[in-house]
């Protein structure tokens, strides 16, 4: 990655973190933050799994520090963001795979792992292992649907590939999805 691509990637990453923090309160209820899933999937497609993970981690930590929200901001984001990027890469650029990765990673894995975090570290009582699954799944489906429509339209117009090329990341040309 040359110096220009590195700087552009850093600026894009920073902008996505800022946008993620600012739009996260929109449509948010505890355990359901569709706008975070939109950012996770977008980052996974534009920059890959590790940048997506770091973006979700940064957004979660900032939201916890500034907005005083519980650790659900982390457990509900990092697994989906990472798996979204991995499945996008493994599928050779299928947007539906990135959305599916977010749904599985956050809606199922992250929601189940939120139980011990909230019970033992946060002191919440009366929870079950499946307590967060419905709200996490709904949040990821809503955010994933928005991301799919956005990224699919960008792919059709060629903007997605152009942005990926400018960021210097691995790009894929979608075919027959």
Regions found by a protein language model. Name each.
Residues 1-177:
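Loop-helix junctions at membrane interfaces
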